[in-house]
Amino acid sequence: MTAILTWNIQCGLGCDGVVDLARIARLARSMGDADVLSLQEVARNDPAIAGGADQVAELQALFPDHQAFFGAGLSRRAAGRARREFGNLLLSRLPVLQLFCHLL
């Protein structure tokens, strides 16, 4: 059976006001061994969120047995920096044959 976990991680922000993606990964694993994780509100290069961390890369490193696919719902140019992005991250240990991103 395929196990799927979907979660709005709110950029990793906990109830204690601390951004901790390792804690998110631990909690996700405690809920079961998900083959596919669909994470909403993941940020990349936004200085207002976790000091501009690349949360996509961090989460991918925390789930090394999963492939990462990121779809930015918001993508803004930033002077002298990588694009500031905010969106959804799909982590899959199963093969992904097709992937579509639909902007709403």
Predicted region positions:
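Active-site catalytic loop in hydrolytic enzyme cores
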Residues: 94-104
